[in-house]
Amino acid sequence: EMLNMIKKFKKSYFKILSYIILLILSLIVLLPVIFMVCGSFMGKSEILNSYGNTISSSGSENYFHIIPEQATLKGYLDVFLLDPAYLMKFWVSIMISVAIVIGQVVISCFSGYGLAKFNFPFKNVVFYFVIILMMLPVQVTLVPNYLIFNKLGLINSYLSVILPGVFGTFGVFLITQVFSSIPNDLIEAAKIDGANHFQILMKIIIPCSKTGIASLVILSFIDSWNMIEQPLAFIKDYLKYPMSIFLSRINETRLDIAFVCGVLAIIPVFILFLFLKDAMIKGVEYSNMK
């Protein structure tokens, strides 16, 4: 009995210790978000005083604090009512990200179905080529894409940002893994009933792969929402910049606006993660399959 009590104590001890460590790590990760949310309810002068030193008659005094002493909605009112440029950047990011997600899901489903369920010459070579392209840093493709879009007259167009995302190879790789896990017996049974490949894809494969496709949606949206290099390289008009670029261009005279825009920028990703967190974890598992 003594040994059992010792074992139970050790298990409880390590369990409590692991929870404490996870709590500390979670707080470290969430600390910038907490600063940003609290800072969005501060005025400009309070932000400067809170995150820096103020000079008084007695010398340099640090007035650092997180909770607003004089909470205000002025930053939010300025964003929503005073200057529409801030919200315009938000909707530009939404438009680009949604277009990329829809296009990538469509392309990935058709391509993944072909790679997963068709046998053709050099199939493995094509799949390995997809993996190689997926491993290339985005910076490597910027110059070739710029030259192509310049020839097509798409520079300073949203298409120059959307098209590379739509034809990204990560979605093809992920969906190929998802479709490969579906038994071929379902496809053979559908063929016996007279279904063509399009019907098989739409009525059997995709309904059986909702979790994998949902994971692609959230991973693709997050990647598109946070992209910086492509808009900087392909879009020249400042007014067309998405939120990710716009946030880095807000100067220190509008720190209250910067905090508010930062809060707005994390809302779509937070909502997606809230509803599709299980699908995202499943997608990571699929991406690690061999």
Where are these regions (language model features)?
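A structural signal for multi-pass alpha-helical bundles of membrane permease subunits
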Residues: 6-290
